[in-house]
């Protein structure tokens, strides 16, 4: 069982000073539990990402995706790690490739393969995966992070817009930022997402 704290009130039944026990088998909780495990140190100078929306959907049948970034912060940055998010899938084999000096912003693999790392996730969630060797990226150049998942039935997380009585979230993707590989070619997410 979990020892839980009710942060809303200490005046509910079956609790002691706002704490109560909740069985793992209690049907009042959903089928997923979230635990956050953070690194204690700030290991990276910059974080390149395209932030999402308030809700995530699954793109089934697509195993490869990519993001293209432009190095802007320093004369010569080092890419040391890549994050991937698999909100509901565990034990997923992956291969991550980093390409530098891109020659075509519509093709994430159009540059030089600078790093490749493979592994398997052990739990669902967001993973920070360290590269075997840091990749040097000069200021102003474009680089791509390509992620390939090797487990059938796994869906890629993709944020989408939400609007209801308590929350409104708008999602927008610009061109030449994020890509999906399907039907034998790269497809820009800006053409897939709603604007």
Residue ranges and their predicted role:
Residues 1-12:
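Catalytic nucleophile-His microenvironment captured as a short glycine-rich beta-strand/loop
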Residues 24-108, 135-142, 148-195:
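Beta-sheet-rich sandwich/jelly-roll-like modules and their strand-loop junctions
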Residues 6-8, 133, 149:
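A mature extracytoplasmic/lumenal domain signature
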Residues 108-122:
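Solvent-exposed serine/threonine-rich low-complexity stretches and specific carbohydrate-binding patches
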Residues 11-24:
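A short macromolecule-binding patch
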Residues 125-127:
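Short strand-edge motifs at loop-to-beta-strand transitions and within beta-strands
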């Amino acid at each position: 069982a979990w020892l839980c704290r009710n942060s809303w009130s200490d005046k509910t039944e079956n609790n002691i000073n706002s704490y109560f026990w909740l069985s793992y088998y209690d049907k009042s909780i959903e089928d997923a539990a979230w635990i956050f495990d953070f690194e204690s140190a700030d290991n990276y100078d910059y974080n390149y990402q395209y932030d999402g929306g308030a809700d995530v959907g699954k793109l089934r049948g697509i195993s490869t995706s990519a993001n293209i970034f432009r190095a802007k912060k320093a004369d010569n940055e080092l890419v040391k790690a890549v994050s991937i998010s698999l909100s509901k899938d565990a034990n997923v084999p992956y291969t991550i490739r980093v390409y530098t000096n891109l020659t075509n912003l519509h093709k994430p693999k159009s540059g030089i393969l600078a790093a490749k790392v493979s592994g398997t996730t052990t739990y669902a969630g967001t993973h920070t995966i360290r590269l075997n060797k840091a990749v040097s990226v000069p200021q102003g150049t474009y680089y791509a992070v390509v992620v390939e998942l090797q487990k059938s039935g796994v869906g890629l997380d993709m944020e989408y817009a939400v609007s209801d009585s308590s929350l409104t979230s708008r999602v927008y993707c610009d061109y030449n930022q994020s890509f999906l590989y399907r039907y034998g070619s790269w497809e820009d997410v800006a053409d897939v997402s709603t604007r």
